[in-house]
Amino acid sequence: MMMPTLMVMAKLMVESGIPGSIVNIASVAAKRPLVGAADYCVSKAGVAMLTQVLAAEMSQLNVRVNAIGPGFIETPMTQNIRADNEGNMMAMSMTPMGRYGLPVEIANTALFLLSDESSYFSGQTLFPAGGMYTG
């Protein structure tokens, strides 16, 4: 479903002649293997690569394409991890900042990527992940 939606939006942006920005949602799992989650990791790596390919194809058309790869965020998706002492310890051991991200932090990253403040960004995946890739 992602590809048809992206292609329709890209076509509308190009036809309008107005520069545009597309933001995809990947995950830290695009870069970091998670045991027992091969399907999720592979699909998110695919989103990151699709972002790069579309950015290369669409840059000349004034459409920027980027992605966000969140770490552990306080959402229903991480509720079971947060509720389980062992799961929570595992998540925090991977997150140097020692806390879960907030949904608003992901929203603010999207706002940045959609704004003119990021006009020279294209083909990038930003990782708001509490320092997960610092070491």
Name each model feature, range by range.
Residues 1, 33, 38-46, 107:
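The catalytic Tyr-X3-Lys active-site helix of short-chain dehydrogenase/reductase
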Residues 6, 43, 51:
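Active-site helix of classical SDR
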Residues 11, 56-60, 119:
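Alpha-helical segment proximal to the catalytic Tyr-Lys
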Residues 27:
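Residue(s) in the substrate-gating loop at a strand-loop-helix junction
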Residues 31, 48, 69-80:
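Short, flexible catalytic-loop segment of classical short-chain dehydrogenase/reductase
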Residues 32-38, 60-61, 98, 116:
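Active-site loop immediately N-terminal to the catalytic Tyr-X3-Lys motif
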Residues 59-64, 121-123, 129:
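Short, small/polar-rich loop/turn modules that mediate ligand/substrate recognition or access, typified
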Residues 95-106:
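A conserved structural motif in NAD(P)-dependent oxidoreductases
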